[in-house]
């Protein structure tokens, strides 16, 4: 399970309570803005054993995807810009948490390409996305960030739960190696996805899955023990 934290943290306390109650350690991809606004929540994440990944400092757009559905690097997005965003977040995290950040990052809005990933890799970061099965047209993006119930990509909380629990059914790897994308804040006034988190955890465990931080998944993939569809292996 992975959670992105941009600027809103109104679901974070409940999420951390649920993860603690169920004994799950997750990976949190945080921006520098999130760390600046919510230092106590960040320290709690670290104290309770969660892994922190880099989500840049200011959550900028990096590619043209929002304009033309292509992942072309935006004008002005340079190696220096990307590395500065990652380093600023890393420095602030270490100041607040008293420990270095891990080696994983996630691009804002899922906007990245080989060039951008290489720039990040040059300063020690491996990109982590979320699981997509293009052949089946399904993925593990919960869409919990979609607040408008009339949107064609809106899913009710119970629909999100069922999409996760049924992901990969009938396939050899099933959801093994899968990475789920959730968020630490929401604009939904009701039907909040994180309220289904305990049921999601219980359902996945009943199917025999272990829920681990990204670093443990990455190690298992390196040893040949993970699923083929992992977004860690696919986006080096």
What are the functions of these language-model segments?
Residues 1-70, 74-77, 85-103:
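Active-site beta->alpha N-cap acidic-glycine motif
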Residues 41-45, 67-70, 142-146, 225-231:
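Short low-complexity, flexible loop/linker segments enriched in glycine and/or proline
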């Amino acid at each position: 399970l992975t959670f992105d934290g941009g600027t809103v943290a109104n679901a974070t306390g409940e999420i951390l309570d649920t993860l603690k109650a169920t004994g799950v350690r997750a990976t949190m991809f945080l921006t520098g803005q999130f760390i600046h606004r919510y230092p106590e929540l960040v320290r709690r994440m670290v104290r309770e054993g969660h892994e922190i990944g880099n989500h840049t400092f200011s959550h900028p757009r990096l590619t043209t995807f929002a304009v033309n559905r292509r992942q072309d690097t935006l004008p002005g997005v340079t190696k220096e810009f990307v590395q500065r965003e990652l380093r600023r977040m890393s420095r602030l995290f270490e100041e607040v948490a008293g420990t270095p950040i891990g080696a994983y990052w996630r691009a804002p809005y899922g906007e990245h390409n080989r060039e951008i990933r290489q720039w990040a890799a040059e300063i020690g970061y491996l990109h982590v996305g979320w699981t997509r099965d293009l052949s089946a047209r399904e993925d593990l993006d919960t869409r919990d960030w979609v607040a408008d119930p009339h949107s064609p990509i809106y899913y009710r909380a119970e629909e999100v739960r069922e999409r996760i629990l049924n992901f990969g059914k009938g396939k050899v790897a099933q959801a093994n190696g899968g990475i789920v994308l959730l968020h630490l804040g929401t604009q939904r006034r009701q039907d909040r996805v994180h309220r289904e988190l305990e049921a999601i955890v219980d359902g996945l465990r009943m199917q025999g899955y272990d829920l681990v931080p990204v670093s443990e998944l990455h190690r298992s993939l390196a040893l040949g023990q993970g699923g083929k569809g992992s977004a860690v292996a696919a986006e080096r």
